[in-house]
Amino acid sequence: MKKVTWLGMFLMIIAGCIGVEKESEIKVKNKMNISPELQDIIRMGTLAPSSHNAQMWKIKIVNESEILVLWDKNRKLESSDPQNREALISIGAFIENFVEGAKKYNYEVEVKSFNSFGEDNSVAKLILNKKEFTNTDNIIKNIEERHSVKTLFLKEDLKSKDISEILDINKSNVTYYDLESEKGKYLKESVYKAFEKEAIDKGVQDELAKWIRLSDKEAKEKKDGMSAEMMGMGGIKKYFYYPLVTEKTIKSNIFVNSGIKVAKKQTENCSGYLVVKSSSNSISDLIDTGRTMEKILLKANELKIAVHPMSAVLHVEPWKDEISGKLGLTEPVQMVLRVGYVKEYGEPTSLRRDIWDIIVE
């Protein structure tokens, strides 16, 4: 009888929490009265990539023409991103999607990045102004279809035309290194060695375990992190993956060593690496880097070039300190992207939160 009573109380508490959450959500929706157009623009913003799919962004709607973009401190990656460098880059990608998505509804977006975090952790202001745009279907298609590809790529040279189209996005900050070039070989080796070192770091393992989803139910509830599909475990593979994987197994030597072996194959099987640098590590420069990165990813989707961010080389010593010099660059490297053609380009599988999960009052 006692067990039943406690179970009943537990279910009532859970039901109560769900009820409060729904009431709160409805209240926010009704109170803010956001237009369907702005809702869709925000949704397209949320399709941006982020480390561990942590989705570190929030927004505050001042009015239909003015939006504040905030860093969500509750989604900070303490071990792999202690300085919030990648968080700001991800926010920049969110902003770029917002800017491009707004064209669908004939809005030009002025972006004003801040020099420091606001009291509410705001980092940028977006101002929407009416302006007519045409032929936006391809822009929206690329936003909707963009995704990271973590499979092995074909070891084929990128077409000169494709390289030029990508480099034209930002010639001063984007460089391509062919896999067989001297610097391409340095990147291949360094990206792998850095991943190997980072993979055995306990703090990084704990952080990774927090963001790996262990069931379809958890993935559906949290709407973030890495599901089986995002890790290449679709179909029959997922059927076996979820029952076998726990937080403990994620940190096991077998799991870690398996990841290291996969990383080695990934670094060796591609066309080369794109490197994105910035003038400094300021908030505005990192946001600009994120915007540049997203422009690259959207163009790559159009060209059907697979892209896989490989960030460990920018987290771990000695590589994070030496990479700019080794590549002959005088400014900080912010992103390293493995690129190449693939037999099957695939489709997006990333989890995404609803727009009402990221809007704050």
Task: List the predicted regions and their residue ranges.
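Acidic, surface-exposed loops and disordered segments
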Residues: 16-361
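Sec-dependent N-terminal signal peptides
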Residues: 5-13
